């Protein structure tokens, strides 16, 4: 029986070897293997989309529903802005209860407008779409979100006290023609992120992850962790 051929290159040999890898680009690149050049990057147009923001298709569907509800077409945008401004005050979660009726919706309550939105996307995704509009509106009128103090925001960060604040700088949101009156400051961004983290932590503190209802395990508590314990166990900055 002959010995298997050696695949080891002799020591000192100057003969080059070529190694093929699974990720190598073919010599003749076409189709999905095409290599982009500078012209592509300078001329290509990207359509910005975010799964945190309502899409243009979503807005078209909501617009059709609102038309059926007899929301006037000529004030429909203002009705949307009013609703989102209201959400900056009361919140945009699925559990948020809308209050009263805005001045642009032909007597249709904000609750009904929000219910129609939820047939297409989440209320927060809708609010994220108009966050830059509401940001400018609040700054122009020096009117921060109503609950900024209750949420623990400092006065200098009060305009960031709404739960879709991240939409202000999201490129998929609708931007006013003049742009932002001013961009959010780093301190405002940090305050908004901190508030969101604390809110999530408190919500988790209300959940029950016990595997048993035995009092020896639950210690008579309904929730798994108290809010105080949750805050104490927050990771350091």
Swiss-Prot record:
GO terms for cellular component: helical viral capsid; ribonucleoprotein complex. Coiled coil: none annotated. It is found in: Virion. Its main location: virion. InterPro entries: Pltvir_coat (IPR000052). The keyword Ribonucleoprotein applies. Keywords: Capsid protein, Helical capsid protein, Ribonucleoprotein, Virion. Pfam families: Flexi_CP. Disulfide bonds: none annotated. It comes from the Viruses. Residues 1-24 are annotated as: Disordered. GO terms for molecular function: structural molecule activity. Belongs to the potexvirus capsid protein family. Required for genome encapsidation. Forms ribonucleoprotein complexes along with TGB1 helicase and viral RNA. This is Coat protein.
């Amino acid at each position: 029986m002959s010995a298997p051929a050696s695949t080891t290159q002799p020591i000192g040999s100057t003969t080059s070897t070529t190694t093929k890898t699974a990720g190598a680009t073919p010599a003749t690149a076409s189709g999905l293997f095409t290599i982009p050049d500078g012209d592509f990057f300078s001329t290509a147009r990207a359509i910005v989309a975010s799964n945190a923001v309502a899409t243009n298709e979503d807005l078209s569907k909501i617009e059709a529903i609102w038309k059926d509800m007899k929301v006037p077409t000529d004030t429909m945008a203002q009705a949307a802005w009013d609703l989102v401004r209201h959400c900056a005050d009361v919140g945009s979660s699925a559990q948020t209860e809308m209050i009263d009726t805005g001045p642009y919706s032909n007597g249709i309550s904000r609750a009904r407008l929000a219910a129609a939105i939820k047939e297409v996307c989440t209320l927060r995704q809708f609010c994220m779409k108009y966050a830059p509009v509401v940001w400018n509106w609040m700054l122009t009128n020096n009117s921060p979100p109503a609950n900024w103090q209750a949420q623990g925001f400092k006065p200098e960060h009060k305009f960031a006290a709404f739960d879709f604040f991240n939409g202000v700088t999201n490129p998929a949101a609708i931007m006013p023609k003049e742009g932002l009156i001013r961009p959010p400051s780093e301190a405002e961004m940090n305050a908004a992120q901190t508030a969101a983290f604390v809110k999530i932590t408190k919500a988790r503190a209300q959940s029950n992850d016990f595997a048993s209802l035995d009092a020896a395990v639950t210690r008579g508590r309904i929730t798994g962790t108290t809010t105080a314990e949750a805050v104490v166990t927050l990771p350091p900055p």
